[in-house]
Design a protein with these regions (language model features):
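Active-site-adjacent helix-turn-beta-strand microarchitecture at beta-sheet edges
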Residues: 105-179
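Short, solvent-exposed aromatic-acidic interface loops
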Residues: 67-70, 151-155, 205-208
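Zymogen propeptides
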Residues: 32-128
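Bacterial N-terminal signal peptides
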Residues: 18-29
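Bacterial N-terminal signal peptides that target proteins for export
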Residues: 3-20
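Short, surface-exposed charged micro-motifs
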Residues: 52, 136, 191
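Conserved, well-ordered active-site substructure
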Residues: 107-123, 178-227, 235-261
Length: 261
């Protein structure tokens, strides 16, 4: 199945680039309808369109990814797709999953296959990563979760996979305290939440949205009591069901769901 690679001009995310690929769109008037066995779909919530993917209940394996077998960062989805294919696996969806440095390696906690590559980052600083409370997305014995950074540190968890990012979008059912309904900063954004069924729901906006609008989608539209922001400048999605393979900019840590052929 050939996937369409989407690229942007030098002014990445220019307004002319906000184009949704043709898919069924579900209008939300409250919680999102159940997705059934489909892993990805487009939804609308309060006038905005989002693409969502879920790994729960559909036989997919969910993992984080950063370095290829060569020891270099994948940077683009097609590298990950090809490596999985060589191993007899099919990538169903993937997205960028956490912030990184100039070397495309994570700046916060990162765990892959039980190995801690980068330790938990509890420092203060500038930028979205340090807009506390921030948090950790993790997969422990196949079960996904999102915890605020300090809560994760105290939990004693040693998950199989994890990626730290920030800020938290929703924390115990409440929006991040620094988000405002009158906020004016609009960007394409992506993140992950854990819904009331315990499924990880990955979301990318199809147009520029505020932090408040994005967080509200997770809490009120997707029934997520905890959700974590991944990024807002390089947000990218690979979704086989949607025929989509974004290649705007090189990426650092990724999260992806795959199945065996």
């Amino acid at each position: 199945m050939g996937l369409q690679r989407r690229s942007a001009p030098s002014t990445v995310r220019a307004s002319s680039a906000w184009v949704c690929l043709v898919t069924a769109v579900f209008i939300l008037s409250g919680p999102v309808a159940k997705a059934g066995e489909s892993s990805c779909r487009d939804v609308r919530f309060e006038g905005q369109t989002y693409s969502t993917c879920s790994s729960g209940g559909n036989g997919l394996t969910l993992e984080t990814f950063n370095l290829s077998k060569s020891g270099e960062p994948y940077r683009y989805f097609f590298g990950l797709e090809q490596e999985l294919e060589d191993d007899g696996k099919v990538l169903r969806f993937a997205m960028n999953a956490g912030m990184y440095g100039e070397d495309f390696r994570p700046i916060g906690l990162y765990i892959e296959n039980g190995k801690q590559v980068k330790k938990l980052n509890r420092r203060n600083g500038n930028g979205n990563f340090h807009l506390k409370p921030n948090g950790v997305f993790f997969i422990d014995n196949g079960k996904p979760g999102v915890l605020e950074t300090e809560a994760f540190a105290k939990s004693g968890l040693k998950p199989d996979f994890a990626s730290q990012s920030g800020p938290m979008l929703v924390l115990d059912g409440k929006l991040h305290p620094k988000f405002s309904a009158t906020g004016t900063s609009r960007k394409m954004r992506n993140g992950v939440g854990i819904d009331d069924k315990g499924k990880a729901v990955f979301v990318i906006s199809e147009g520029p949205v505020t932090f408040y609008e994005f967080a509200k989608l997770f809490r009120d539209g997707l029934n997520c009591r905890n959700a974590l922001f991944f990024d807002g400048s390089i947000s990218s999605l690979y979704a086989r069901e949607l025929g989509r393979n974004d290649s705007f900019l090189p990426l650092g840590p990724m999260v992806g769901a795959f199945e065996s052929k």
